[in-house]
Amino acid sequence: VIFIKREFEAYLDELASITILLPTERHHGESTHFTLLFQEERHQLQIIERNQLADYVKYRCETKIPILIGSKYMVEDEHGRKTDLQIGAVIRTEAFDEAYYYDGEDLGTTYYPGETVFTLWAPTATAVKIKLNAPDSNELIYYSLIREEKGIWRITVQGDLEGFLYTYLVCVNLVWREAVDPYATAVTINSEAGVIISKEKINLPKIPLPPFRRPTDAIIYELHIRDFSSHPKSGMNQKGKYAAFSEQPAYSSEVGITGLPYIQELGVTHVELLPVNDYGGVDEAEPEKAYNWGYNPLLFNVPEGSYALDANDPYSRILELKQLITTFHQHELRVIIDVVYNHVYVREDSAFEKIVPGYYFRHDVHGMPSNGTGVGNDIASERKMVHKFILDSIKHWLTEYDVDGFRFDLMGILDIQTMNAIKSLVDTHKPGAILLGEGWELNTPLQTDRKAMIINAKKMPGIAFFNDMVRDSIKGSTFNLFDRGFSLGNTHKTQALKQSLSGSINFDPHFKGLFLEPTQSVNYVESHDNHTMWDKMALCVSHEDEKIRQSRQMLATSIILLAQGIPFLHAGQEFFRTKKGEENSYKSPDSVNWFDWERKQKYSNEVEYFKGLIQLRKSHGAFRFSTSLEIKKHLTFPIEKGHLLMCRLNDVKSYGKWNQLLVIFHNGLQTETVALPNDSEWDVLVYEAKVSFNAVQKVKKEIMVGPISTVVLGQY
């Protein structure tokens, strides 16, 4: 960026309002009048307000002529000094949004073998050029784009441009900036330029799965592309790559079945992938030298290159990610992708900021970028063209990659209108796709009643939220390491646990409920963020031996899998995943983050228990009601005393094999005798960390419940 020396500065802050800053070092910052110059025309500005600042006098002026944004204007003071009229805060006004909103479907590139059309939205630019670089050539070709209505710039370039690299050169406020197309769908290594590709070469056959019926039928398993295969004993050859998931069969002589077959054996329904779109923090040429979770978005419509077999080949990452999703679908597993529309990696370097400076991000009352995300910038999703970009991006992932859902990072930054529009779009293109997100309240300049956060969940039916109340009631606070939840022996969390088990709905007068329906509650005790449960327990209950801690984690996981709502599981939770005590492993080495396949083998009995609980949940609809009415009709809590909580599911024969189900959660260290509700026999389905569907064991009247355990009984 070249520094422009100006005698004074003038900014268009509203469509008819100009702010002028005159330095006091000359004429004491005084001017009795200002003139707006446009081509050969001269128009007097009306001074509305004058304020003395430390080094400037600030004037607010109004113009009676319409300003054509994207045209060159000059402002002249009474002393004959001139400066260019810069684009200021006008771009963050509703009037600007209305005037320059473009609803076309052609942003980006449209490739044909004989020509390519380039379309860019850059309303504040006074000139736009495209820089083309032929493949395997150093020759650069420049073309000037033609400005059209609504701030659109367009050009059609003749010839077959497949494989050509391209970037835009955009002039705003006299400064030229080079940027990658934010609508690019293919890029060079490390995203230095967009690449023109042929869609015919990336068309893989899609595997149609029937629409997913109910969100509460889902069992979500969260994992990171690189983590899953990077361990030396993973049995996968393409370690850290998309391609690892397509290796069949994946097997290690030391740890048995691995890879995708292992996920399929677990019985989960959806795999949620940490971000797979292009991100910063890892050099795609040498990915082994750094690690990152992927929450540093660079380009939103391009797969990350560090997971590709050949990041230099723009087709590689696209085809390999598509093949990964196709392979999952072949195995009747669905794919949710983690999307990060709340911020960019570095605001100043982003394509958004270079092409339309100041538009795509929120600013505070002082005009400074807001930082509710904690990473230096907040995406302004409420602005029309930001809203459109997000919806266009969602549509791209649905139609091009055939994903089955989206997890929205820091969703509380986004606005409710955008999230509901996404829900409508997704329902149209992929009925049954799941939308879930982090509904935390964040300090961003958007009205509270417009934020897509958990306290506004009832305004967003059909969108699910990570339920931190569930997490804290079972495990204990994430932010207070020594706070213990029910599974860690805290009997004071029993009331909160009842709310968690009932889907966090309006279950009784004591709890007004977070959600309209249980389909909005994502129930979890751990995720990629913060300590794993195993690592928290190493600090929180360090005095307890390992066997007791295993029982506590198994109790916690059983609650997640038997509660009303959507169960969410962190990959490796089934074998007590550890990150060696690291609380925030977002850039820690593979040895901290990898999926430790040796633990899977070491804790094979516990993994089998995990599988059994999943099968139990899937076998009976009473564990996964989709409406609050069903929960209120069938769920009661007949016993709540000390370390014990009993749930009863009544009259549920229409949902599965058993008419009555009892679930007992026990967090105490002593065996307890529990009286059963009637004199008839009960099938023992879950007992002593084993799951059985064959009714090998039956009980009547009472049952002995062992320390820190879960018991499930069924009656016809």
Name these PLM-found stretches:
Residues 22-31, 121-127, 668-669, 679-680:
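Short proline/glycine-enriched turn/loop motifs at strand-loop junctions of beta-rich domains
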Residues 507-508, 565, 569-582, 592-661:
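Glycan-recognition and catalytic regions of carbohydrate-active enzymes
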Residues 25-43, 128-133, 140:
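Short, surface-exposed alpha-helix to beta-strand junction/turn motifs within ectodomains of secreted
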Residues 226-401, 411-414, 418-430, 434:
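Substrate-binding/active-site clefts of carbohydrate-active enzymes
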Residues 190-197, 201, 423-576, 580-586, ...:
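Conserved alpha/beta catalytic core and glycan-binding cleft of carbohydrate-active enzymes
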Residues 120, 168, 223, 263, ...:
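Conserved, mostly hydrophobic/aromatic
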Residues 2-14, 51-117, 139-140, 148-247:
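The feature marks proteins involved in alpha-glucan
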Residues 122, 162-166, 696-716:
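C-terminal beta-strand-rich structural cap/linker in extracellular carbohydrate-active enzymes
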